[in-house]
């Protein structure tokens, strides 16, 4: 094997090692992103449920306020 072939082989092996390292890093990052997505999805579902509950409370309070306003108006005629 010539010196040039040896250098090329070493360079190719180094490229392969670098590629495998980067691939491993990307795979790890992808797994972490999947976990983050799952947690965010769960949190969003919980927040959505809470928003719906609060919206119902606001609607209920609005209805109560309207009834009280009507009673007040009727009593002060």
Curated annotation (Swiss-Prot):
Function: This protein is essential to promote the specific transfer of the plasmid in the presence of conjugative plasmids.
Origin species: Escherichia coli
Domain of life: Bacteria
Lineage: Bacteria, Pseudomonadati, Pseudomonadota, Gammaproteobacteria, Enterobacterales
Protein's UniProt name: Mobilization protein MbeD
Keywords carried by this UniProt record: Conjugation, Mobility protein, Plasmid
Family, per entry: To E.coli MbaD and MbkD.
InterPro entries: MbeD_MobD
Record gene name: mbeD
């Amino acid at each position: 094997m010539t010196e040039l072939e040896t250098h090329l082989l070493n360079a190719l092996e180094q490229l392969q090692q670098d590629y495998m390292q980067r691939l491993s890093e990307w795979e790890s990052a992808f797994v972490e992103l999947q976990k983050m997505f799952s947690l965010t999805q769960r949190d969003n579902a919980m927040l959505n449920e809470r928003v719906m509950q609060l919206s119902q409370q606001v609607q209920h309070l609005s209805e109560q306020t309207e009834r009280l306003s009507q009673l007040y108006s009727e009593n002060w005629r």
